[in-house]
Amino acid sequence: MTTHTKNHPCRAKARPYIHPAIRYNKRRMAESFRSRMMRWAFNFFPAFRGTGGRVTYIAEDWSEVRIRLPLNWRTRNYVGTIYGGSMYGAVDPFYMVMLIRRLGPEYIVWDKSATVRFQKPGRGTLTARFTVGDEELRAIAQALETGARSVDRTYQVELKDETGVVCATVEKVVYIRRKEAPEKSLRDE
């Protein structure tokens, strides 16, 4: 008796693979050599590697970053789902780093706070997509030009499973301000 692998009972739970560019229904900007090197650096950096997360894509202009967080022996908790600390740790650094890269060296950017809402246990590989558009950069510059010393911006990212169901939502508050010009000393005059 021959069984086909398509009808095999172990294959019944397999979900079809959907390419990330199709899943998010957006055209993907090509990675540059520099952004690819940063992706590799993130993936090999011990603090990020310890979360179990993997950066899968960084746009050349840092307007988009994508990550995945698989369920494996490093991310599995006592009840067999993805550990909540791994979920948060995998998404923690990206909005701050993206804003630092997009705004440039004349700005100071810090994470100020974070809130995590767990909606469903992560029972498989989770993905997250971070975006910081040009309109967001204009809004930040405009807020700082109106006389405000600093501005707090709130960003939200969702960790989704393979079927697109949201397992956790992370809300990050990021502090941004312009660097002040160094004061001239009397010797400089």
Regions picked out by a protein language model, each given a short descriptive name:
Residues G50-V55, K112-F118, I140-Q142:
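Short structured motifs
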Residues G50-T81:
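Catalytic strand-loop segment that frames the active site of acyl-thioester-processing enzymes
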Residues M1-T3, A12-R15:
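Short, low-complexity intrinsically disordered segments enriched in A/P/G/S/L with frequent Arg
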Residues M98-E135:
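Hydrophobic beta-strand-centered segment that forms part of the acyl-chain substrate-binding groove
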Residues H19-G50, R74, Y78:
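Alpha-helical membrane-targeting segments
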Residues T75-F94:
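Hot-dog-fold acyl-thioester-processing enzymes
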Residues A21-R28, S32, G122-R123, G133-E189:
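HotDog/MaoC-like acyl-thioester-processing domains
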Residues T5, P9, I18-P20:
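Short hydrophobic alpha-helical segments enriched in small aliphatic residues
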